[in-house]
Amino acid sequence: MTVPTTRKDLMIVNMGPQHPSMHGVLRLVVTLDGEDVIDCEPILGYLHRGMEKIAENRTIIQYLPYVTRWDYLATMFTEAITVNGPEQLGNIQVPKRASYIRVIMLELSRIASHLLWLGPFMADIGAQTPFFYIFRERELIYDLFESATGMRMMHNYFRIGGVAADLPYGWIDKCLDFCDYFLTGVTEYQKLITRNPIFLERVEGVGIIGGEEAINWGLSGPMLRASGIQWDLRKVDHYECYDEFDWEVQWQKEGDSLARYLVRISEMTESIKILQQALEGIPGGPYENLEVRRFDRAKDSEWNDFDYRFISKKPSPTFELSKQELYVRVEAPKGELGIFLVGDKSVFPWRWKIRPPGFINLQILPQLVKRMKLADIMTILGSIDIIMGEVDR
C-alpha cells in the first residue's frame, strides 16, 4: 500500500479572468501554501479600449458617450468630470437649476453604485439573499433615470454649461417618494446584515489599512475614509452646489472590510439627505447656459454667410479648449475620479489623462491578501469595489 505524500512545494492558482466571483475580467495569479496566500499578482488589461487615445480625436461633445463606459455603474460621475474640465477651461457659468439637477443625478448614481457593490459583495461572502434585494431599489433609481434622461444606464445627460434636458413634470415628487421608501430599505439592510455573526466573522479585522498607509498608497473614497481620514472632495473642492446642503462626511477608524462596508452604507443615507434638500430647494430658471452655444472665434463675424455655430441647439461643435492644462476631480462612489486635461487652441484635447479611483485602490490588494487565507481574497477584493471598465480604460 502506497502512502500519499504531503506536498511541500507552493501551488500557483489562477483566479479569473472568468472566475464567478471575480469582478469583471481581473486575473489574480495567487501563490498558495496550503490555504495561506504567499503572494498575489493582479494582471490587468483585459478590458483596455484606449479611452485616453480616443479622446484626442473627438470633440468634448462627441466624446461624452464614450466616458460612460469607464465606470459603467456610476455613469453620471464620468459625464460630470468630462464637462467640468472644459467649463473650468472656458470659465463657463452653470445656471443654479442645472447645478441642482446635476447634484440630484450624481447622488442617485452614487446610491445605485453602492447598491450594486453591496449585492455582489454579500454574495462573495456567502449571503445570496441581499443580492436580490438590492436590485429592487436599484430598479427604482433606473426608472427615475429613464424618465429624466431617456436611458437606464449610459445616460449621456450632462452638457457643457448645464444638462441636456429639464426634469419632466412630476419627476421631483416621484424622486421624493423614492427617498422616503429607500430610507426604510437601508434600515432593512442594516438589520439584516450589520449584526449578522457570520458576516462579522468574515469581514471584521480582514484587510486592515492604517490611515498613513492609505495616504501613502494614494487611496481615495470609502477606502480612505474607512481608515480614519475625513477626506471628501464634495467638502474639499466645493464643486457644484454641495456647500448649500447640510450633510456629514462618513468615516470609520478601524480600516478593515467591515469599516468600508459601514462607510458605504452610511453614505447612502447621507446621499438621501442631500437629495431631499436638493429636491425641495431646487430653483427655477434655465437648465443650460445658452452663452456656450455662441463660442465665436472671429468677433467681427459677418452675418451674410450661414454659420451654424450661432443657432445650434446644443453647445457649439467648435467649442475650443484654450491652451492651458487643468486637473479636475469629483468624488465618485469608488473614490477620486480625476482628469488631467491639456488644451492647445483646438476643438480636440491635446491630452486627456484619466485618474481612475478603482485602478489606484486596486494597487494595495497584493499587500492586503498576503498571509491571509484563500477565502479572504474575495472578501478583500469585494470591499475595495472595482469596476474593470475604469481600471483598464
UniProtKB/Swiss-Prot annotation:
MF (Gene Ontology): NAD binding; oxidoreductase activity, acting on NAD(P)H, quinone or similar compound as acceptor; quinone binding
Primary site of residence: plastid
Gene Ontology biological process terms in this record: photosynthesis, light reaction
Enzyme class, spelled out: translocase
Localization per record: Plastid, Chloroplast thylakoid membrane
Membrane topology: Peripheral membrane protein
Pfam families: Complex1_49kDa
The reaction(s) this protein catalyses: a plastoquinone + NADH + (n+1) H(+)(in) = a plastoquinol + NAD(+) + n H(+)(out); a plastoquinone + NADPH + (n+1) H(+)(in) = a plastoquinol + NADP(+) + n H(+)(out)
Subunit structure: NDH is composed of at least 16 different subunits, 5 of which are encoded in the nucleus.
General function of this protein: NDH shuttles electrons from NAD(P)H:plastoquinone, via FMN and iron-sulfur (Fe-S) centers, to quinones in the photosynthetic chain and possibly in a chloroplast respiratory chain. The immediate electron acceptor for the enzyme in this species is believed to be plastoquinone. Couples the redox reaction to proton translocation, and thus conserves the redox energy in a proton gradient.
Name the UniProt record assigns to this protein: NAD(P)H-quinone oxidoreductase subunit H, chloroplastic
Source organism of the structure: Ranunculus macranthus
Gene name tied to this protein: ndhH
